[in-house]
């Protein structure tokens, strides 16, 4: 093992990272400092985490509140790009990794650590995301990934490892779901979900109401958008984190934001995930409604390309890269006119933009009307159609001439 004196571990208080603390001490002979990122996963997840870390053998535990920064500097910029991975996934886990890695590096610098560690498995995307961020922010620090080194390969073996060392752990050996939560979403993987023929039961979902059990009466919300950012809900000005929290509560009550997908992982395999993103689903619907009004056809096409590019780079862990800065700058320029108000209808799992307006709207009722108008000469369409269809006309004529 390399000569490591002090390592900062991205610690959650779960089974894996509880076992990693003593494993690092035993195998590297180093001091272990636990770092916990509060990205809005909830008080229940954070309760007693410092005591757990020290009981596992950590010399210190730093709990860093990142909730506001996460939503303001990571969620909101991503929303401006319209990024949705493979057309469905709103990237909740991927969005949180850069800020967690950044804060972990900051703690490492603060305590004088010479290494970083995480509890990501060797099969998943997160190992790549974390370590790509480490490489960009702290190339001088060694990275230790226990799941790629140790021989512990199951929940049972991890529990046994902790029991042998008299380290308390509340986890059980029962096969349960792997979950990841933050202010934006919660993900569910594993268990019977690994069979894509198995429909998720209600015990899977923890954040949203069942659409069937949601209120029988729809609820309407008015969202205010300024330059691609949601700044108010029902005319009440709120911070980004507050906007998301309010929308999470309301949308979750109506069963909005559930998706069940099989996605292509960065490491080459497919995986199935169930995601709950209630407030984020409402936010995305509102911003898309504004884009419909203010972006011309070519700009919307360009925005679609940017959205796909940003979704891929974010999913792949390329936040701290020139590519991210370039795509973000392009998306930001398209948001210059993305301001207005959207009324959304929430009802039994669905969210629909039913009213929208913008001072920069390119929609003109005078031009679009099916009734009589004085601004559009329909005869002008004939010349346009002849030019637009000219390539098809030439090809057809040549085909006729060749017999």
From Swiss-Prot:
L-aspartate binds at residues 121, 125-126. It is an enzyme of class 6 (ligase). Its EC number is 6.3.4.5. Pfam families: Arginosuc_syn_C (PF20979), Arginosuc_synth (PF00764). SUPFAM superfamilies: Adenine nucleotide alpha hydrolases-like, Argininosuccinate synthetase, C-terminal domain. Keywords: Amino-acid biosynthesis, Arginine biosynthesis, ATP-binding, Cytoplasm, Ligase, Nucleotide-binding. The keyword Phosphoprotein does not apply. It catalyses: L-citrulline + L-aspartate + ATP = 2-(N(omega)-L-arginino)succinate + AMP + diphosphate + H(+). This is Argininosuccinate synthase. It comes from Idiomarina loihiensis (strain ATCC BAA-735 / DSM 15497 / L2-TR).
